[in-house]
Amino acid sequence: KCYKEASIDKVHLIRPYKNVLNELKYLKKNKIKFSIVTSKDFRRTKYLLNKFGIQPSSIHCPNKKLKGKPHPDHLLFSLKKNKIKKKDAYFVGDTKIDFLAAKSAKIKFIFAKYGYGKNKKIYKYQISNFKQIRQIIKM
């Protein structure tokens, strides 16, 4: 099986990182817009968002119209669609590719140390728990 098929078969095993669900619900409740920009396919992404009750302002997955990360296309499209200024935006990611996308889009990057990426670079904003997001965005 290819990766995409295998990952769809195992999607029910995926669990969110600690505090992510509560914090996303907190953002939504406080009218803070957030989007999902991922390298994962739309079908799997939508399934997981529905499963965990996450309702982002928009969802951006690989497609034929926009270049994927590290290109900034999806981030810039999300900002435009949601009427968010670059100066007000943050992109949370866990890989160097995520950082490069944010840098190319000229938006602030928050490195999630608990994720996949094991990058030794020291980023201006880093979190080891998603709950720390409030401190960075000054909520």
Go through each PLM region and give its residues:
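Short, basic/glycine-rich phosphate-binding loops at helix/coil junctions
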Residues: 1-7, 54-59
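Short, acidic loop-to-helix structural element flanking the phosphoryl-transfer center
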Residues: 5-36, 42-50, 72
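Asp-based, Mg2+/Mn2+-dependent phosphohydrolase catalytic module
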Residues: 41-139
